[in-house]
Amino acid sequence: MITIVGSGRVGTAAAAIMGIMRIDKKILLIDIVKGLPQGEALDLNHMSAILGLDVEYEGSNDYKDMAGSDLVIVTAGFPRKPGMTREQLVETNAKIVSDIGKEIKKYAPDSVVILTTNPLDAMTYVMWKSTGFPRERVIGFSGVLDAGRLAYYAAKKLGISPASILPIVLGQHGESMFPVPSKSFVHGVPLSKLLSEDQLREVVEETVKAGAKITELRGFSSNWGPGAGLAIMADSVKRDARRSLIASVVLKGEYGVFDLPVEVPIVLGKTGVVKVLEIELTPEEKEKFNQSVEAIRKLVGTIPQSYLQ
């Protein structure tokens, strides 16, 4: 069973796409708002019937119903508003994530946890601390979305399908994220060889600002992109597909970083992170990566200690 904590736009989009992909036969939605997860589950069950899917959705306001879940996806949290930075969300969402982490530890102690709550890397740290789980089972969703956006904007410049691009984005999920064109390939040819410096600069800028642009245009943050990315990650866990993808995970010496969640390439399977993939960076790329790491470290340092226990 998959449990999704948070029945807002991202959680329900993820639930719908997971059902369409037939990733699991039962998907539980949990939310603190009475009636919300139940209503979303009923609507999704109607969708399932119309599409002929063998998927059952259930809604609940009680964390104990997640018992038996092998995958818990956390999308709950205070939403990002227009003009708001991820950093402004820290204290409010740290409490939410810490509380949810304790419930997961109690009712689904063997689960793999994937979360989307912003600021993503800092909240991954809170979840890691509050659950006490090994780092392999606490994964921040970010890189699949960031890499997808990089592929989308680069493909538009090149006039090719985004599926032809193998994108790499490192560092922080946020304003200091670090797309790496020299390690992002189109059938073995790096983007840095296919695009001019001006084009690369535009692609990187569009990738970094994509989330804020969506929020500015429609008044609330993205949900379909994150929903699709979560479904891809869930599929890799549930089927033990061992896909290589980008995610925020606590590093234990990789890239010279210790005990800090950073967006890096990983292999994802049924036990969570199977392997962290280290790619060789140029001195300039390493400097940018380190700057992004320091931005994460600074943000983590602002988290109240009471939420890290």
From Swiss-Prot:
Task: State the active site.
Answer: H173 (proton acceptor)
Highest taxon of the lineage: Archaea
Ranges in coiled-coil conformation:
none
Q: Which UniProt keywords apply?
A: NAD, Oxidoreductase, Tricarboxylic acid cycle
Molecular functions (GO terms): L-lactate dehydrogenase activity; L-malate dehydrogenase (NAD+) activity
Q: What is its EC number?
A: 1.1.1.37
User: What InterPro entries does the record point to?
Assistant: L-lactate/malate_DH (IPR001557), Lactate/malate_DH_C (IPR022383), Lactate/malate_DH_N (IPR001236), Lactate_DH/Glyco_Ohase_4_C (IPR015955), Malate_DH_type3 (IPR011275), NAD(P)-bd_dom_sf (IPR036291)
GO biological processes: lactate metabolic process; tricarboxylic acid cycle
Q: Where does substrate bind?
A: R80, R86, N118, R149
Q: What class of enzyme is it?
A: oxidoreductase
Q: Which residues bind NAD(+)?
A: G6, S7, G8, R9, V10, G11, D31, N93, T116, T117, N118
The answer to whether UniProt assigns keyword Lipid biosynthesis to this entry is no
Its recorded reaction(s) are: (S)-malate + NAD(+) = oxaloacetate + NADH + H(+)
Cited function: Catalyzes the reversible oxidation of malate to oxaloacetate.
Q: Which PANTHER family match?
A: L-2-HYDROXYCARBOXYLATE DEHYDROGENASE (NAD(P)(+)) (PTHR43128), L-LACTATE DEHYDROGENASE (PTHR43128:SF16)
Q: According to its UniProt record, which protein family does this protein belong to?
A: Belongs to the LDH/MDH superfamily.
NCBIfam families recorded = PRK06223.1
Q: From the Swiss-Prot or TrEMBL record, give the protein name.
A: Malate dehydrogenase
Which organism's genome codes for this protein?
Pyrobaculum calidifontis (strain DSM 21063 / JCM 11548 / VA1)
The encoding gene: mdh
